């Protein structure tokens, strides 16, 4: 008998209303955002109630949901006004809140009935008994701790019917399930109440301090300054394991990341899910393309976290970043004129005549070309556009759509050959 596979939700991050709309347009089945209170990303451009309402209405047009992360650790006095705040979320149409502190869970359950509760990864759920415990308290979904292995995940799925949400992409915290106090000590900002300063990613000098002896600087003896953060997670080539093991929601980290990141990563995971559910062969055919696409927005090296064993020193960033993005985000498409074969684009980074670029859009559409026939908003021919947010027009040989993105290779020179056999040297 053929096993029926459940389609997992692709859950994308959205730090702003713009990012929410981009995530939904690029295939997210749901997005998670932060509000003005109770979250862990105080610098993520969190949503007002009005923005939430607009986001919920926009997502609904695409059949997508909006969740709100409210996963801070509560201290005495923080609960004031919480009931009213959560009732407002419920009335706006927020599909669920992501919570870790039992105090907030109790407040939501008793003072905002009808608002679905998901357990945050901050609660460190690592076994099926924990999921069953939270189920008894009315929670419908649990975000597993990042420290759970694939073998453990499979066993949890067999023994509980609670919805499982699992991280598949993004930054990894050096502390257990993100519960860290390093930021408190280094910058007097409480990471568990929305103030993480990412102290683990700072550069440090190391000293050898044998007992009873004078400390000795190791500067010069080690190749780079020390940092203690992890590489990023990417499970794009292991999506079959996630689907086969019955994960209900594939979570992408990154509410503070750019629309370039959100669009690219969402696009890839949606394509991966669609391909595998069509056939394993279809997934294998595009797998390397998906992996290559991820490197275009990577800020650090990529690994699989704890899913296939305890991370080694190769999954830690003990020194300088060893890989950098090959591409930079330069523009988004506003409109396309089929007759003239020109696109109006809103610039995000400097663009030059002759730059080699790649257009990409929802549905894993992409093609490469180069910047040709560059004009400003007044119709003047220009060679360079250095100022962000300008409206520009360029010649584009293939049709593109509003909301498509444009990125460029970052450095170097490439000889680009046109169809007529002539070549131009472009910055890459």
State the predicted function of each range.
Residues 47-52, 80-84:
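Charged helix-capping and loop-helix junction motifs
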Residues 80, 114-115, 119-128:
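Gly/Gly-Pro- and Ser/Thr-rich, intrinsically disordered tail segments characteristic of DNA damage-repair
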Residues 1-26, 30-33, 37-40, 56, ...:
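Surface-exposed amphipathic alpha-helical tracts and adjacent flexible/coil segments at the periphery
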Residues 103-104:
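Alpha-helix capping/helix-boundary segments
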């Amino acid at each position: 008998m053929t096993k029926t596979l459940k389609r997992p939700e692709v859950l994308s991050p959205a730090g702003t209303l713009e990012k929410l709309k981009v995530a939904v347009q690029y295939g997210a089945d749901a997005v998670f955002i932060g509000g003005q209170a109770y979250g862990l990303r105080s610098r993520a451009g969190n949503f007002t109630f009005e923005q939430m309402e607009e986001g919920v209405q926009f997502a609904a047009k695409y059949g997508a949901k909006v969740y709100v992360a409210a996963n801070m650790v509560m201290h005495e006095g923080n609960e004031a006004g919480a009931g009213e705040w959560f009732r407002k979320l419920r009335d706006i149409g927020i599909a669920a809140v992501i919570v870790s502190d039992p105090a907030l869970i109790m407040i939501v359950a008793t003072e905002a009935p009808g608002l679905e509760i998901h357990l945050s990864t901050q609660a460190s759920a690592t076994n099926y008994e924990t999921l069953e415990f939270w189920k008894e308290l009315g929670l419908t979904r649990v975000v597993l701790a990042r420290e759970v292995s694939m073998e453990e995940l499979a066993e949890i799925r067999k023994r509980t019917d609670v919805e499982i949400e699992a991280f598949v992409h993004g930054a990894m915290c050096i502390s257990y399930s993100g519960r860290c106090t390093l930021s408190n000590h280094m910058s007097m900002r409480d990471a568990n109440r929305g103030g993480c300063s990412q102290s683990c990613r700072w550069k440090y000098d190391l000293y050898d301090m044998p007992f009873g002896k004078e400390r000795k600087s190791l500067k010069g003896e080690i190749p780079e300054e020390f940092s203690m953060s992890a590489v990023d997670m990417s499970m794009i080539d292991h999506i079959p394991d996630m689907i086969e093991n019955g994960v209900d929601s594939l979570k992408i980290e990154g509410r503070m990341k750019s629309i370039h990141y959100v669009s690219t990563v969402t696009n890839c995971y949606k394509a991966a899910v669609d391909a595998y559910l069509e056939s394993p062969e279809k997934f294998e055919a595009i797998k390397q393309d998906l992996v290559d696409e991820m490197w275009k927005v990577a800020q650090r090296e990529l690994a699989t976290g704890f899913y296939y064993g305890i991370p080694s020193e190769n999954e830690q960033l003990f020194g300088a970043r060893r890989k950098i993005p090959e591409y930079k985000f330069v523009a988004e498409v506003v409109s396309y004129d089929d007759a003239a074969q020109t696109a109006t684009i809103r610039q995000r980074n400097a663009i030059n005549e002759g730059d080699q670029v790649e257009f990409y859009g929802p549905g894993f559409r992409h093609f490469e070309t180069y910047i040709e026939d560059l004009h400003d908003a007044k119709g003047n021919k220009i060679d360079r556009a250095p100022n962000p947010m300008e409206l520009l027009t360029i010649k584009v040989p293939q049709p593109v759509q509003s909301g498509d993105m444009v990125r460029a290779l970052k450095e170097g020179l490439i000889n680009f050959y046109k169809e007529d056999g002539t070549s131009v040297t472009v910055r890459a």
